[in-house]
Amino acid sequence: MEELQGYLKKDRSPQQHFLYPLLLQEYIYTLAHDDSLNGSIFYEPIEFIGYDNKFSLVLVKRLIIRMYQQNFLIYLVNDSNQNRFGGHTNYFYSHFFYSQMVSKGFSVIVEIPFSRRLVSSSEEKEIPKSQNLGSIHSIFPFLEDKLSHLNNVSDILIPHPIHFEILVQILQCWIQDVPSLHLLRFFLHKYQNLNKTIQSNKTIYVFSKENKRLFWFLYNSYVSECEFLLVFFHKQSCYLRSTSSGAFLERSHFYGKMEHIIIVCCNNFHKTLWPIKDPLIHYVRYQGKAILASRGNHLLMKEWRYYFVNFWQYYFHFWSQPYRMHINSLLNYSFYFMGYLLRVLINPYAVKNQMLENSFLIDTVIKKFDTIIPIIPLIGSLSKAKFCTFSGHPISKPIWADLSDFDIIDRFGRICRNLSHYYSGSSKKQSLYRIKYILRLSCARTLARKHKSTARALLQRLGLGFLEEFFTEEEQVLSFIFPKTTLFTLHGSHRERIWSLDIIRINDLVNN
């Protein structure tokens, strides 16, 4: 335990005071404009559902000053004065809006030391700032290179803490002033009470669902704590030196990649060394789902599952069911990760070998990493978004019928381009044509609904080339990337995997 405490003190930053700049009107943007924070997550605008504004540090600063002048922090705690804003409804919306903005400002402040820690760690490891670690597609080349050489995989659903106090306790080592922890508890209890009003007010529910920056930060801190201690316990059971690992801060998520973690696994009582041949462990995670793959046998994966379950139980004080960690062989198992269906294909080949006058055939097997577009979950997402029925029959989008023709076509075209861009790494892109077909007819039906016509009459009047760019956008991009001298033709380009290193978050229509 003393060794663990020393490890925690060595790696973590000093405790911070957060409530002082929040209450005393210190300009938060001056902290964010520090040279070490340029280009960090604080400059990316976040859309505000139900408002024309976009969340920014300047907006947070102005609202904090306004609340300070009106002593609004007192009214946030005191719910009895509900007529201050002219009625219960106006008070509820104003109360919720100010509470959300203060929570966002609080989350911006507590993110600053994490960003400083990220910059300092990258400078120590001499990691260039222009790296492609911000792209979530950078995980797939790693899987493509490593997964085909491994035997077993375990896809893990990281459990959510059952109580908000667990999240507060995790931050106690970072936050020194007690009032900040009390303010954090206040936000969490307000969020918990807000969920009780979901049935009575769906607008507030949608608003709270899209504005969870503080709660994402808390959850990411919890996951980062899991991986932080995972590295420590791995080092305790390590007989071979492992390479360095790190956690990188995205706009709204942490994700970590630990490559080439070489271990020799001991049993639970540290008595006998298991004779496991080359037990190479690979770990990747995005949001709440992680993948643990190994070249070792099934017993090694069961040991890791036993460790995870006990770790969550004794360190975070909640029980996690073992069925949340599925252990399967990579040769006969497919699993979902970040909107893709991943698997390892076995391609048998017969190689003819000629030795002098004798010739014989040698059977060999080549493993290949395969990425598939899950069409059925995508159709389900389109159905929830009211683009089609549950069976995939295209329907009109009535909420967009009041827009101009250009805006309607642009929105549908943007969805198609984003999906094509996100699934550029699939080896079977022709399966995406059905999704484009649904969106194309949904666009035609929406335009027909606006002009009080039928989709058939609209398509006959505009011709077969209507919305053809939905289907040719990807080919135009590929023709620009690959010259005509490339060995493969554009007709077969749907088999080529192209990982895009400019995607920073998962697509809204993709089921994670």
Swiss-Prot record:
Gene Ontology annotations for the cellular component aspect, listed alphabetically: chloroplast
Coiled coil feature spans: none
One of the record's GO molecular function terms: RNA binding
Pfam families, alphabetized: Intron_maturas2, MatK_N
Localisation per UniProt entry: Plastid, Chloroplast
An annotated GO BP: tRNA processing
Top-level taxonomic group: Eukaryota
KW Plastid (keyword) present: yes
Annotated keywords: Chloroplast, mRNA processing, Plastid, RNA-binding, tRNA processing
InterPro entries: Domain_X (IPR024937), Maturase_MatK (IPR002866), Maturase_MatK_N (IPR024942)
PANTHER family linked: MATURASE K
Role according to the record: Usually encoded in the trnK tRNA gene intron. Probably assists in splicing its own and other chloroplast group II introns.
Similarity-based family: Belongs to the intron maturase 2 family. MatK subfamily.
Designated name of the protein: Maturase K
Source organism of the structure: Lilium tsingtauense (Twilight lily)
Gene: matK
